Amino acid sequence: VFAQSLCKGFRVSIDDHLADFDWSRIQTYVGYAEMVPNAVRELAASDVKEAARLGVWIERILLSVAGPCEGCAPVATVLVAVLPRMTPPGRSVALDLLSQISAAEITGPAHEQIGAVDLEEIRQAVASGFQYYVGMLRETASSDADLYSCIGLMDILAFHDRSLAAEAIAALKAVRTAGRATGLAVLIDNTLDDLADPSSDSA
C-alpha cells in the first residue's frame, strides 16, 4: 500500500521526532506541553476507545474559542511524521486533529493567545503531510472518516497555497464515492468549488 512505500527506508523513531522539540518550553491552553510526547506515543499505538480519549485531550490543550496556541505547530509536525506508524484508529484521530489545527483561526484578542502563534507556520507544519493526505484519498481502503479529514485538509491547505491546488483537485476527483457515506460526494463537490481558479469566478 502507499503508506508502506512512503515509509520505505524510514528509520527514524517516534522518540527521535519528539526529541526535535523542547516540550517543557512549549505553551498550550493547559500549561506547558511536557505530557504531549507520551500522548503521541499512546495515540500511535491506540485502539478506538483510547484514540478517541487522546484526541479529545490533544484538541483541548491546543485549540479554544480564541484560536490555536503555540503548541499547534510542533504537535502538527510530530503527528505528520508518525502518521505512517500509527494504528488505524490512532491515524484517524491524528488526521482529524490535523484538519482542525489547519482550519484554526485567531478569533480572540491578543491577550488570550497562548505563546507565539503563527498561522502560516501552523499550516506549513500540517502541509508537510500533503503527499500522505493525497495518498489516503487515492487509497480505496481508506475509511470514510479518514476521507472526510483529508478532504478538509485539501480544502484548507490548497486554498491557502495555490501551488497545491492542481494536485489536490486531481486527488479529490479520483476519490471513489460509490458505497460511501452519502455526504462524501457533496463535500468533494463543495471543496472543488472552493479550490476553483478564482479567475473563473469573475463574470
Regions found by a protein language model. Name each.
Residues 103-138:
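Eukaryotic alpha-helical solenoid repeat scaffolds
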Residues 167-203:
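Glycine-rich, aromatic-bearing surface loops/beta-hairpins
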Residues 70-77, 110-115, 124-128, 163-171:
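Short sequence/structural elements of tandem HEAT/ARM alpha-solenoid repeats
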Residues 48-59, 105-111:
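HEAT-repeat alpha-solenoid elements in large eukaryotic scaffold proteins
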Residues 58-64, 97-106, 154-158:
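Hydrophobic residues within the alpha-helices of tandem HEAT/HEAT-like
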Residues 51, 72, 91, 146-150, ...:
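Residue-level detector of extended alpha-helical repeat arrays and alpha-solenoid scaffolds
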Residues 37-49, 77-84, 88, 131-142, ...:
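HEAT/HEAT-like alpha-solenoid repeats
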Residues 2-49:
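N-terminal "cap/leader" segments of large eukaryotic alpha-helical scaffolds
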